[in-house]
Amino acid sequence: MSEPWAAQTQEQRYDELLQQTGAALIGAAPQSWRRIDLIAKIAEGVQDFGLTVIMSDFSHAEVDPPAGAAQALVELRRLMYRPERGAWLSARYVLNPPGEFRIFYNYEHDPLWEPPIPAAVFQRDLATFPRPAEKVPGWLRRLVEQAGGSPS
């Protein structure tokens, strides 16, 4: 049984990581941005971050995803892992001025890595973040089985 303080500490860390992500994104964006949209695809040992910054005139600014946001999201994924559900496969962090954000987590759908990552990466990810067989999406099960592994 977990202690109430442990849950509170986890919630506090969750909030801190989301704030760190937002602060890093705002710090990397040019002045007069209208929306910041970060897509994070994370598997054990592999990460891909795509950042879109829309300016007030609706143009797009070329901005590299900041390392601080990437590090916070990698830690957030570890923190959010639950054995009964697994770890999320991708997340989308959308930020609007002055600092209002929403985050969406994908636990089921193929994050469509480009280029595709090897099945061995997903096998490693499932070994690090196991989930019950019924929580392994069909696309992921097929991919891991085709590579000769077991998805659960």
Give each language-model segment a name.
Residues A28, S32, I36, P83, ...:
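Short secondary-structure junctions and interdomain/linker hinges
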Residues M1-V53:
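N-terminal "first-domain core" detector
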Residues A69-I117, V121:
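Amphipathic protein-protein interaction modules
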Residues M1-A24, V63-R78, A120, D125:
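Short, flexible domain-boundary/linker segments around small modular repeats
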Residues Q31, A40-G68, F104-E114:
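Extended intrinsically disordered, low-complexity coil regions enriched in Ser, Thr, Gly, Ala
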Residues E100-S152:
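Acidic, proline/glycine-rich low-complexity IDRs
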